[in-house]
Amino acid sequence: MKMKKSLVALCLSAGLLASVPAVTFADVNFVPQNTTAAPSVPTAALQQLVWTPVDQSKPKTAQLATGGQPLNVPGISGPVLAFSVPANIGEIALTLTSEVNKQTSVFAPNVLILDQNLTPAAFFPSDYFPYQEPGVMSADRLEGVMRLTPALGQQKLYVLVFTTPQDLQKTTTLLDPAKAYAKGIGNAIPDIPDPIARHTTDGTVKLKVSTNTASSVLVGPLFGSSSNGPVTVGNTAAPATAYAAPA
């Protein structure tokens, strides 16, 4: 997709919110606002999708097999999930979680962020959503947080979730439940093999929208910015007429 001027400013954080475990990223030296690595999706195809609204009042959980939509574009495998989030509430923290299915399979998410005109603004590949070990209140999962600061005039942002042919060739090594239990109670960790989850086009994905930035750490230079402030994508002139998603 040919890069147009975007109207979204991005603040990026390498950590999660205080309420969830810290994430170790596989590769933090990438620039999310560089969307050239993302699949090229025609605007007309994006306009055919039904964008499910998600706000900070309640997380949205969707299953690819039942809630996914077809998007026949090179570089995208299987169905996609399409969400819209409010862009007029200040800085947004989007927590994306992909649950591991019975320790055998998992959906490896990629996320393309689009501004209110459906112009690509940021791309978060699957490496941005690393494996998280199970905890007291959480199961095995792939998870990451995307921190976005929409430019003035934005009303909505669009979140496209998909996987790729390359991701389907990979697997994720999990933590064996016996090891997790031993680790949790402080016992010696048994020397047993860990299960391996294959990557599939199906899975359960949860998207949470938050405006709580008390624990955020701005790390612009880590992602290729030359300053500590928010990374601005495109210009912040008055926006053109926004795309109106179908009701």
Predicted region positions:
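Gram-negative bacterial Sec-dependent N-terminal signal peptides
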Residues: 1-25
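Activation corresponds to long, low-complexity, non-globular regions
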Residues: 24-51, 172-247
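Non-catalytic, beta-strand-enriched accessory regions in extracellular/secretory proteins
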Residues: 65-88, 141-143
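Exposed aromatic-hydrophobic patches
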Residues: 81-84, 117, 122, 136-149
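Noncatalytic modules at the cell exterior or secretory-pathway interfaces
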Residues: 89-94, 147-173
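Short coil-to-beta strand junction motifs in C2/discoidin
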Residues: 103-110
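Solvent-exposed beta-hairpin/edge-strand motifs
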Residues: 110-116
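Solvent-exposed serine/threonine-rich low-complexity stretches and specific carbohydrate-binding patches
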Residues: 122-134
